């Protein structure tokens, strides 16, 4: 997140979000309350956080996914349903369905892949990787369910050596 130092001071500085599990979202909410914000992609900025292993990505998502859903079982159910309908059912229909179901699945899968290609191009990734979007979404679905499960056990938000998320209700 790029911002001016005086703008950060105006919203209370880092102290204002010190206890937030998802600090970038908490900071964005502080700025959003003051007016419009711009979210965008650029070639000129690179992340300094490294996620070299699959488990690093899983832990990063699991750490905060259920918190992002407000620890709400209803929002979790909605997110699961949306991910299944949008990303999982189309390729299953394309590969295992027949007739109209297969055509619908192929069309939906092709559309999601085509819409993902511009993002892949920004990061210099082969457009063929767009075909993996359903598998990526399914992985995120599993990470989100793990996040909820860990929160319900009082072990959510593990970050920097401690459990930081509140216990799910």
Question: What feature does the model see in each segment?
Answer:
Residues 58-62, 89-96, 165-169:
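Short, charged low-complexity intrinsically disordered segments located at boundaries
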Residues 25, 36-41, 46, 129-169:
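Membrane-proximal soluble regions of multi-pass membrane proteins
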Residues 2-4:
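Conserved beta strand-loop-helix elements of the APE1-like EEP
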